[in-house]
Amino acid sequence: MNELWTLQSTAFEKSISATTPHPSDKDIIHNLILSRLPTLDQPLAKAAAHHFNSPGKMLRATMAMRGAHVLNVSMPAATRWAAAVEVLHNASLIHDDICDGDKQRRGHQAIWTKFGRNVALTLGDWLIALSFELAAEAAEIANTPRLLRILSKHMSRTTAGEAMEFEWNGILSWDAYLTIAADKTAPLLTAPIQGIAVMIGDYQAEAIINRYFRDLGEAYQIANDISNYNGSDGAKLIAGDLARRAPNAVTLSFIDGLNTDEKARFNDWYRSGDTDDLALWQAHILGSDAMKAASNRMFATLDRATHHASDLSAEISEVVTPVHGLIMRACSTASKNGAA
């Protein structure tokens, strides 16, 4: 380990013991991330501080830490792995906001809105580098070099899902939509537990964990799609996916319910990129059974995830149960709001 890494580790661990005698896992990981952000005299400092001032649910980090407690993984390794996945997730959010044009993130201005696209792009890149630095530290402590390959693989798949969305033309199949949804969401839900399992030498769980989180990720994405239409997703623009022609389960469900002539008319408008009739089509979609159909598909996907969960070991099942419950609640809330 290099001298700088040792100094950073010591400073972080001292700060935890000095400021919070019994900090939560979320606080520990958040403080670790803050301790590794650029200092005030460095570029990107203000943008990084703005973004991490509201850390969000930190679902991925807390899942990794819960796994570490249950499976007795080294805490120094686990905290760095949890932070690595969380930082990579945040890098993807910053880049997503640029791509999607979303102006808000966690109730505050998105980085690209407040600081400009160039700063947002470079901050996202910088955080990716930090993520791999933290993963390398975890791998060194746990003597598990495979962690870097896990992080790389999941980053690659997430990026591929995002890139596939750029080619979306509104007439792709449900299979294509679900591939995009799972590739964008599932990898960074899978990584926290997969890394913890690998640290204890459990390589058998990998395939089951992947299947489980792929279905869970699809269900979660459909819930987000429903929330996008009813304005409860935190984005400034209601039905923003429709405006920018982004893949959305509600839009696809609406198309499925149209007759041939109606489908042709909608597809012509959709492909044109015109937003003049956006409110009209939004009203048509909200007045249809599209939200209900999307909800039904979401719950069917959630049922598949529940089935895969039964194949998990008792220890891994204990780790993912809170996450499963959280996503079930998110799906139920989205469905309820969509029916309102």
Regions found by a protein language model. Give the residues of each.
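Short, amphipathic C-terminal "tail helix"
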Residues: 3, 315-340
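Mobile late-domain/C-terminal helix-loop "cap" segments
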Residues: 264-310
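Alpha-helical, largely C-terminal catalytic domains
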Residues: 188, 244, 297, 312, ...
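Non-transmembrane, amphipathic alpha-helical segments
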Residues: 17-21, 51, 173, 177-181, ...
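Amphipathic alpha-helices that form helix-helix packing interfaces
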Residues: 12, 29, 212, 219, ...
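Mg2+-dependent prenyl diphosphate-binding active-site environment of isoprenoid biosynthetic enzymes
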Residues: 28, 34, 38-263, 328
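Short, charged, amphipathic alpha-helical segments
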Residues: 149, 207-210, 267, 296, ...
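N-terminal amphipathic/basic leader segments beginning at the initiator methionine
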Residues: 1-36
